[in-house]
């Protein structure tokens, strides 16, 4: 029998003395019972969805949103749903994939839930509408309903569209989650998760004289809120396909859940910008910590004022100023000052020299009295003085007048988490700085005839004073002023990449498309891929083939066509991947576009942006015509991959354990940016401690030998450290150019991790001899040594000695803290255990005829 040839293999092996055991089932059932159970479930799902389509078919809601093309008759829709259900042998994907994506709500449901939009259920108001608390009659869920019917006109509709499309695309634990929306006549409504602790300004600025039971927000919670807000902005600025500038970061837009986790909301002013890096201009004072790069953009941004006075940076008031990520950084700095001081950015109840928070704290800095800015309501001894001083210092760095001198949010996160030691960059003297808002400008000024600023009164504040706002371009000493109001001057000439229409005709027909995964017809995919022709084949992937396609004439896609469509295990993997991947959004994760289950097929549709497997570039570069992955690209791939894994482990609503991080599940786009895929084995774990621990103990080890952590193979318990181990193997593959397992070698040398660890431990080879020979010595020695060291600590046998993924990101940015504090060597006993278990695995594989 000839040895099997394969790219990789996913399997479960028997123990040394036992036989292959069947997978553990929750309950045993006969085939007849299982089939009947599936059919009964299917009829309920089909009936429910069919009824939903019948009610929505022809309705104004569906037609106006143009969310799907519904040209079929009611009967044909039901038949197609039933057909896809039977094709999947009990798996009705159309009712599951995207079930957590925003949906259309009926107006009657929201009307009943808010008691007819009762004033008693108003949570707050501002911007373009009011927010109501609602109890959904359908499932008893409490939500927040933002009613946007108070303003009319094109600008109002554009803002509604901006907020809807922005939030619908985002997936982060520190962003307010959009549940859905409703269009009813002239009323536009957005439905969000309900936040029990309301907005940060309500909690932060309450006074004991108003509420005798009031207790000020403690220091630990304040720090947690600041870190959460920083993580949200970092995600918007750097972790998406297009950069999102929020433009209205303030305490009233930071919501708090039951655990006081920060959730940034209100995306009515948000703008999408393409990433483009300009490394020519930056402040070198931040270089010692991480690469500090100034972002410029290809897409035209709004040059008109948008935001709230007190949080807007000085450059916002100049003619033709473009909003950038540094606009949000400035606003973030002001919010941090509010959190530390417990007072508003602009507060007329203070004496003249303290009305403007930023100007007052700057004067304290010049007088070396930063701690005087701390909230006097905090009990002495309840916080560390150095922590408070560092927080104020960081806030002032973020709110510097010159945007190029402000740090980016990645650097801010490092400063907040203590990822680097030492002092922060020194603050300048503010004596020569112009005042942010001179007191002379705190007077009502006439508004010019060209002013289009919209002002609203915020009911969430204890006192409300309005000022007129001038649109005239004035010197820095005459900044326009207003209080508590968002300024909505946001008309644009550029196009929003998330919209499917020309910006000049924005919402004129009330038609736009949300960019979420959808079911795609088989005929469309046949047409897109030229009937899955060999000429369109781009790669062999897990249990199938990937094809390039052009959908609807303008969307470049990759279609993964799975074989063995009758295999129950593969059907499960197919549905699992769709359900998992459709819930995530990150620039270094492959983007799911849709799926198809017609005619017994299992087709998954992705963006075409990434179409080359990392393993192919690393291990097949000896083939004529194949290019070598250069060192700079390798290092950047590892950094980006680490950010993607951190998003899965720490930044999404649930903790995601991938369980299949390999060089074969990483694809590269034309710019060598990585996209992690292969989510069929992923575990989604609640961040609730009890549920999290219970979920981790379920299941058996599944993955690719050579990448699976020793403790995971032994116990089957999925943990983040198992992913870190797999990540470490990929790092070592990048350094050495050698695959995780090489069966052409002797069995004791087949496992790359053990081989490299032994070589380094015995000092048999120099660094340049370990490096991939195809690099031709063209690499940065310090970076190569860092990656080698990182790969070794990530693949330690004891998971407690491995770094977390956040520590991995810091190491890649140049931090030595982990190595200094926890870089002890692994014991010989642990290495011996790993060696023995690996040799056992290799013997079992050879016994199965796998070479």
UniProtKB/Swiss-Prot annotation:
PROSITE patterns: PROTEIN_KINASE_ATP (PS00107), PROTEIN_KINASE_DOM (PS50011), PROTEIN_KINASE_ST (PS00108). Pfam families: PK_Tyr_Ser-Thr, Pkinase. One of its GO terms (molecular function) is protein serine kinase activity. The active site is at residue 248. Residues 117-436, 532-819 form the Protein kinase domain. ATP binds at residues 123-131, 146, 538-546, 560. Induction: Rapidly induced after both compatible and incompatible pathogen inoculations (e.g. Xanthomonas campestris pv. campestris and Pseudomonas syringae pv. tomato). Weakly and transiently induced in response to wounding, salicylic acid (SA) and jasmonic acid (JA). Keywords: ATP-binding, Kinase, Nucleotide-binding, Repeat, Serine/threonine-protein kinase, Transferase. This is Receptor like protein kinase S.2. It comes from Arabidopsis thaliana.
